[in-house]
């Protein structure tokens, strides 16, 4: 149910963005028609100011609002999957009276500890969870870049860049910037990325049910 709420929320907000951009484009077109019909009526200074204002509105929506929203959705969805995996592992531990739980395992992240628990305690074959497990693991890297590096990868972070680049196709782009040093910004240019994430979360837990690991 929570995932459906995420899906509905994403559609609602994305539709609002699309509507706002369409309205600004119509406004720009209508103004330009008036100017073309009566060019002497409008001073160049006024025209430039008007164009700048409309362009700024579009940039604000497309670059600032849309990017912030999609990055926020990605981090929230990963937090959901991480929390849910922890819950199902803890539930499995209690139901099957396992001698060790997540807190007894070592890992670089809660996601890694969950993987260890699933393979050792629930005898889950991670290969059977593909392609969803690898997808979520790649999403973890995207989320970490958003949260810890403000969606930025520096040019000398070759391994990180290559990992994010290999997962990016059809989901986001790495926009190169060059000031004092080369770096890349993650630009989430595909609104369908959010739905794709949700489908992979659902697919993962559907496969986990075969091992009696339930939500």
Labelled PLM ranges:
Residues 74-116:
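Short, contiguous, well-structured surface segments enriched in hydrophobic/aromatic residues
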Residues 118-160:
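Short, mixed-charge amphipathic alpha-helical segments
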Residues 42-48, 108-116, 147-152, 171-175:
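Short, charged low-complexity intrinsically disordered segments located at boundaries
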Residues 82-85, 89, 93, 97, ...:
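Hydrophobic/aromatic-lined pockets within catalytic cores
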Residues 101-105, 154, 190:
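Poly-acidic low-complexity segments
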Residues 1-75, 83, 131-137, 141, ...:
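Extended intrinsically disordered or low-complexity regions, especially N/C-terminal cytosolic tails and loops
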Residues 62, 66-69, 99, 121-128:
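Short, flexible active-site loops
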């Amino acid at each position: 149910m929570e995932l459906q709420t995420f899906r509905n929320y994403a559609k609602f907000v994305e539709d609002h963005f699309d509507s706002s951009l369409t309205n600004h484009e119509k406004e720009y077109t209508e103004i330009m028609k008036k100017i073309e019909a009566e060019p002497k009526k409008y001073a160049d200074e006024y025209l430039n100011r008007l164009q700048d204002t409309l362009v700024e509105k579009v940039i604000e929506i497309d670059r600032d609002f849309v990017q912030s929203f999609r990055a926020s959705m990605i981090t929230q969805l990963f937090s959901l999957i991480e929390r849910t995996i922890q819950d199902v592992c803890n539930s499995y531990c209690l139901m099957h009276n396992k001698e060790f739980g997540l807190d007894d395992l070592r890992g670089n992240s809660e996601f890694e500890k969950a993987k260890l628990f699933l393979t050792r305690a629930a005898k889950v074959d991670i290969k059977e969870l593909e392609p969803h497990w690898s997808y979520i693991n790649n999403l973890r890297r995207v989320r970490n870049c958003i949260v810890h590096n403000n969606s930025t990868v520096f040019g000398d972070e070759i391994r990180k860049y290559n990992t994010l680049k290999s997962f990016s196709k059809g989901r986001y782009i790495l926009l190169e910037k060059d000031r004092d040093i080369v770096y890349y910004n993650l630009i989430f240019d595909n609104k369908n990325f959010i739905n794709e994430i949700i489908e992979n979360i659902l697919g993962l837990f559907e496969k986990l049910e075969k091992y009696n690991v339930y939500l």
